[in-house]
């Protein structure tokens, strides 16, 4: 199976720390070693090959800002949905999952994973069709969070929502109209929050499966927010409702 290339110091460091299989780390010629001391130490401890290469090679492999560091890793694996449900049943406390319906921008997915990790979201669900996948761009945008937040890829979102409901989740869809202000969201139950695509919103089949709908009030001239911004507001609202000020 072909290696995946990840770039950037945060992404590479998290891949090493979490034990993601790494075949080789590439370091740009002339980079100051003190800037990457932690990466070099961890790589040595785990006996990972480190190779110094010209900047032009990193530029070619990365096709994006790389901070002088890249790694050739095994492709990212998706979490198993049935195993995920089992883990949620066994955990203490309430669960939160994000469902991304038609999100195609890898930067948005990376940003969402970063916030999901920060707020303790248990997993992110994406469909196999009409959706971004786990790529180098997602990994870099997530600044390493891709190593910590399970991403589940499913064939049928509507069926997946039914299974979540059967396992105690309430499903909240994000809508612009005929919806409750997200600040009034009740978070005292396990939640699955659906974020639709920026252009189309939720698909009809997915929307019909939601238990209730929430919206983000807006008073400006634009009529929608970036999907990652909307998702972040939702995740932090759930976090705020479940954790008292000063608790964390």
Swiss-Prot record:
<dbReference type="GO" id="GO:0005829">
    <property type="term" value="C:cytosol"/>
</dbReference>
<dbReference type="InterPro" id="IPR001537">
    <property type="entry name" value="SpoU_MeTrfase"/>
</dbReference>
<feature type="binding site">
    <location>
        <position position="196"/>
    </location>
    <ligand>
        <name>S-adenosyl-L-methionine</name>
    </ligand>
</feature>
<dbReference type="Pfam" id="PF00588">
    <property type="entry name" value="SpoU_methylase"/>
</dbReference>
<feature type="binding site">
    <location>
        <position position="216"/>
    </location>
    <ligand>
        <name>S-adenosyl-L-methionine</name>
    </ligand>
</feature>
<dbReference type="GO" id="GO:0008173">
    <property type="term" value="F:RNA methyltransferase activity"/>
</dbReference>
<dbReference type="InterPro" id="IPR029028">
    <property type="entry name" value="Alpha/beta_knot_MTases"/>
</dbReference>
<dbReference type="GO" id="GO:0032259">
    <property type="term" value="P:methylation"/>
</dbReference>
<feature type="binding site">
    <location>
        <position position="225"/>
    </location>
    <ligand>
        <name>S-adenosyl-L-methionine</name>
    </ligand>
</feature>
<dbReference type="GO" id="GO:0003723">
    <property type="term" value="F:RNA binding"/>
</dbReference>
<dbReference type="Pfam" id="PF08032">
    <property type="entry name" value="SpoU_sub_bind"/>
</dbReference>
<dbReference type="InterPro" id="IPR004441">
    <property type="entry name" value="rRNA_MeTrfase_TrmH"/>
</dbReference>
<keyword id="KW-0808">Transferase</keyword>
<comment type="similarity">
    <text>Belongs to the class IV-like SAM-binding methyltransferase superfamily. RNA methyltransferase TrmH family.</text>
</comment>
<dbReference type="InterPro" id="IPR013123">
    <property type="entry name" value="SpoU_subst-bd"/>
</dbReference>
<dbReference type="InterPro" id="IPR029026">
    <property type="entry name" value="tRNA_m1G_MTases_N"/>
</dbReference>
<keyword id="KW-0489">Methyltransferase</keyword>
<dbReference type="InterPro" id="IPR029064">
    <property type="entry name" value="Ribosomal_eL30-like_sf"/>
</dbReference>
<dbReference type="GO" id="GO:0006396">
    <property type="term" value="P:RNA processing"/>
</dbReference>
<protein>
    <recommendedName>
        <fullName>Putative TrmH family tRNA/rRNA methyltransferase</fullName>
        <ecNumber>2.1.1.-</ecNumber>
    </recommendedName>
</protein>
